[in-house]
Amino acid sequence: MPKPAIKTAAKPATSSAGKRGKPNTPKSVAKPKTAKPKTASKPKVKPGEKKRLHPRNLHINGYDFPALMASYPKLKAFVRPTPYGALSIDFADPLAVKTLNAALLLHHYGLAFWDIPKGALCPPIPGRVDYLHYLADLLFEGGKVKRAAAIRALDIGTGANGVYAILGHQVYDWQFVASDINPQSLTNVQRIIDNNPSLQGHLSLRRQQDDKAVFKGIIQASDRFELTLCNPPFHGSLKEASEGSLRKVRNLQLNRGEQPKATSATLNFGGQAAELWCQGGEKQFLATMIRESQAFAEQCLWFTSLVSKQENLKPCYQALEKLGVDTVKTIEMQQGNKFTRVLAWSFHSQAKRLQWRNQIVSGT
């Protein structure tokens, strides 16, 4: 399948209305300034307005616990009525959350087996699949979103759960490379793949050997990806990560009218070290990712990452402008009381992006 011709990533857009040709600059004028990247974002949520999940998200109306228990009877042991007459689980109980995830992945996404080691990050499925739905919109740029087996995506820091790669394939038929620095995490994801025929041959795993690198050592010379995605570590130290986990558990208990308390047994938000924190936290991780992305610009159509902390966006924008990227987009998301956003950037013009995507989807 021939690939579209992509211009060298390091060449910035000129001031001539975004065209790649020679700018029409009068002789009396000094060198043209590099054009700022085109930016776009989703409308911000107004105060008091609740932003729902993505319209294609199967969980937009909450959990259907009777249906989930019918599909996955093990969930029954953890479901209980709430004071408001609904059914729910104790979201501060890691085993309950893990069992709910297994039920969701079986009932909605056809995954026969899913498990994670004790202490590994247990992700909320609705929020994870929301990111993927917005990436599909990003890739098709306002056009009709299609399932396409030719689309390749790279999941940076897949963790022991492998959820982004799993959901991306099950929902959109994308092919995934999933990377992680922790060999135990990759071993567990491989176990999930081995126990699900629908994943076999569609997910491949790569270990990151350098704890200071993001793309380097993972993206190979022959690779081409339509998307990269990442949920970066957001804490800067183990202490900070532990305090954040305890705070979330206490908030859950307060919301249920319970006396705040937390033990190691109740920390569903724990997660292994590489999943929750790194030196410099989210800000430094994003800075490294952006810096390294330039070297792989011709091989990747869109680079994306979740950004948990709003204040980390400004330095990202500044770094991307210095690199001369063509387009930067910020997509705001909300799951319950949690606000986050997707930062996306591409070194290619819209015309080049459409050419690339159309050749991939059409198979020409």
Curated annotation (Swiss-Prot):
Biased-composition ranges for Low complexity? 1-17
Q: Which GO terms describe its biological process?
A: rRNA base methylation
Reactions performed catalytically: adenosine(1618) in 23S rRNA + S-adenosyl-L-methionine = N(6)-methyladenosine(1618) in 23S rRNA + S-adenosyl-L-homocysteine + H(+)
Superkingdom of the source species: Bacteria
**InterPro entries, per the entry:** METTL16/RlmF, rRNA_lsu_MeTfrase_F, SAM-dependent_MTases_sf
Q: Where is this region: Disordered?
A: 1-53
Q: Where in the cell is it found?
A: Cytoplasm
An annotated GO cellular component of this protein is:
cytoplasm
Q: Where is the composition biased (Basic residues)?
A: 33-53
**Where does the sequence pass through the membrane?**
none
Against Pfam families, the record matches this protein to: Methyltransf_10 (PF05971)
Which GO terms fall under molecular function for this chain's record? 23S rRNA (adenine(1618)-N(6))-methyltransferase activity
Enzyme Commission identifier(s):
2.1.1.181
Listed A to Z, the keywords are:
Cytoplasm, Methyltransferase, rRNA processing, S-adenosyl-L-methionine, Transferase
Question: In which family does this protein belong, per the annotation?
Answer: Belongs to the methyltransferase superfamily. METTL16/RlmF family.
> Which PANTHER family does the UniProt entry name for this protein?
RNA N6-ADENOSINE-METHYLTRANSFERASE METTL16, SAM-DEPENDENT METHYLTRANSFERASE
Its function, per the record, reads: Specifically methylates the adenine in position 1618 of 23S rRNA.
Output this protein's name.
Ribosomal RNA large subunit methyltransferase F
Organism in which the protein naturally occurs: Shewanella sp. (strain MR-7)
Gene designation per UniProt:
rlmF
